Structure formats: structure tokens, C-alpha cells
Amino acid sequence: MPIPPARLLKYCLASMAVLAAAGPDIALAQAPDSVISQPGTAPASTFRTDRLTGEDVKPSDGVGVFDRMGAKLPDLPPEKDYKGPIDEAYGAYQRGYYLTAMDKALPRAQLGDPAAQTLIGEILSQGLGVKKDVKNAAFWYGKAAEGGDAAAMFKYALMLMEGEGVPRDKVKADDYMRKAAEAGNPSAEFNWAQILVADNPGEKGLKLALPFYEKSAEQGIADSQYAVAQLYATLKDLPEEKKRLAREWMARAARAGFDTAQLDLGIWLVNGVGGPKDYVKGFEWLKLAANGGNVAAQNKLAHLYVNAIGTAPNPVEAAKWYVLSRRAGLADPALEDFYLGIEDDQQKAAIEAANKFRRR
């Protein structure tokens, strides 16, 4: 489900910087020969990738979830079936009979049934079996939102934020997003948490947002699971039982396919953040993220191959992942020195492997 509140984008980096200062430093333990630093928000050309000493290690740069604003969330858990007279229309909608669903829902929508109004809004907003009509979709979402339908309040809030089919209205959008979040809509909970962080700088906003991130995370939103993991790891004054769950929440987000969570989980496992070190599993998660196209993970994976952390040393694989990350703009002087020091045939093999690479 898309989350396009562009109003929040300008707050992203500032909010991330706030989080970095929200809690005590997390000392990242060094691996025997190397340490993987936490991903940051700096441009690729300044991404720190050379070896670090214990004094160089810095805390996490914060909830990278803010980089995801405007991106697509993972699929939500199945919605509960509508109850009452709209069931038949919703059943037709689920089977792909959109015109039938429209015909059956419209009379109920005209009589003020919020569930039917939401269904009409969904059909019109996506152009399912009918011509896409954002303006009329906004009308029906608005009616359903007035009637208290949580899904409609969320959709209508997004439209108000973007001025899509309805004039922009920040105050009204925030109000409906809050109401949808309080009603338990998981995507609204995530968005309302984002708004709270943006509108309340510092630790105050993070603590206000945390309960909504937690509720959304419990319902399967990977972005929220990632946020919970980072906040549990960095916020001060949280109960120890929550801090102990930070890695588990990161793992949930990683298992849901969130590549940034896969990257961070790999780093946490290698560095022993939130639990014992596990070089093999850390390697596996970084490789998964790297195969998915995450450039920072490709860079870190190259370091693991160079230093034989969680895997056997493999100069060709190390060079391949370095070539891929360098092509994406992530400079790394240490890996460049390594690359220039291997044999010509190894360089050639690495380039050929990089050329054949396809994201999985």
C-alpha cells in the first residue's frame, strides 16, 4: 500500500539525526580482523568503509525508515471481511467481479453505509473495471471517513496530504490519519508515528511515536518493525525487556524482505549488537540483501569475503561485490587497494561475474 505523504519528506534526514542523539552510544564490538560499520545517511562518496578501530565506532545513525517515505509498504495482512449487507458486494470484489461489486455496493453507499462507500472509493481510485476517477473516489472515501471507517480515513488522509482529488489540507489530513491510527489501521499507525516524529523534534517525538510503531509492527508492517528495532536499541529509559527484543524486531523486518533491515541485521550479528555475535548468519543476511541490490550490503559483503568473516576467503567474490557497489557510486579506498592488489585474471573474473549479476 503506497505511503506518499510528501509533506514529511523534508523532515526525513533531520528526524534521523534526532534519533542518533536520542540514546546512549551503542558500542559495536569488533570482529577479529574487521568490523562492519553501521550504515549512515551520508552520500556514497563519503560512506565509511575502511577498517575501524574501537574508538572510531559510532552509534547507529537512526531509523532509516524515514528513507522509505514515498516507497511501497509490504502487503498488509488480509483485511477482515465486511459484516452485514455489504458482504455480497465485497465478496464480488474479492473475486475480481468489480462491476458487480460496484452495482451491489452503490445502493448501500448512497444510504450511508461506510463499508460500501469505502469499497466504491477503492474501485474508483484504482480504476477496477471502470474508468479511474480520483475525484469521485475522494468523495466516497471522505463520506466513509466521516462514518468512521478506518481504511477510508487512512486513504482519505493520504489524498488530503497530496491534494489528490481533493484540495490539500494538512490539518484535516493529520486529523484523519490520527483517527485511523487510533482505530487500528496498521498503515495509518505507521504514518501517524512518522508525523509525530516530524512534528515533535527530539526524544519526545520518538517516545510519542513508539506505541504506534509497535502496534503497526505487531500487524506485520516491516517499516514499523524496523523502526521498533532501532528505537528499542537506541532510546533511553526503555525497559530492559524491550531492549532485549531489538534484534528480534530487526529479524522480523528482515524476514519480511525489507533490505535495509537485512543489511542492519547482518551488521548487528557480525558486531554482536542486541545479542551474541554470529558471523555465519551475519554473512547470510548481508548476502541476501546484496543479492537484492542493496549497495551498502554489497560493499559490506566484499569486506567479509576479504577478511574471511562468516565465510571462506574469496578474492574473486570480494572483487565482484566491490565492483558492483563501486559502479553504484559507493567509493571505498580500502577495497580499491584490495582490488588493485589481486591478480589480473582475478580482476577479469570479478568483472565478468559483476556483468552477469542480476538482482534476486
Language-model regions, residue ranges each:
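Structural signature of tandem alpha-helical TPR/SEL1-like repeats
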Residues: 95-100, 131-140, 167-176, 201-212, ...
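Hydrophobic face of amphipathic alpha-helices that form TPR/SEL1-like repeat modules
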Residues: 85-92, 119-126, 157-162, 191-198, ...
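Short helix-capping/linker turns of helical repeat alpha-solenoids
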Residues: 78-81, 96-97, 110-114, 126-128, ...
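Alpha-solenoid helical repeat scaffolds
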Residues: 103-106, 142, 178, 214, ...
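TPR/TPR-like alpha-solenoid signature
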Residues: 86, 118, 139, 154, ...
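C-terminal segment of classical bacterial N-terminal signal peptides
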Residues: 19-27
